[in-house]
Amino acid sequence: MAKKLPPMHPGEVLREEFLVPLSLSAGALAKVCGVPRTRIERIANEETAITTDTALRLSKALNTSAQLWLNLQNAYDVRTAELGIGRELDKIKPIVTAA
C-alpha cells in the first residue's frame, strides 16, 4: 500500500500560490479583507483554520471561490483526523454494504 502524503494546510496554498507570487504581505491582504493582520498571518503560518467568514473574504479579495478555501480546509481536517484515529477506524466493520 502506498504511503499517503501528509495533509496540506490551506495556509500553504495561500502563502505559496498567492502571497509569495503576488509579493503580497499578510497585512496588505488583511486590510483588503477587513480582518486583523494576525488572522492572515496565522493562516499563512499554518497555525489556524480558515473559517467560512475568512473563506468568503479571501474569495472576494483573491478572485477565487469560497468553496475552494473551505474544500482545502475540509480536506486538511479529514486527513488530519484520519492520521489521528486511523487504527480505530480500521477496527470499525461496516453495517451496510455497497449495493
Predicted regions and their residues:
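The DNA-recognition helices of helix-turn-helix-type DNA-binding domains
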Residues: 36, 47, 73-76
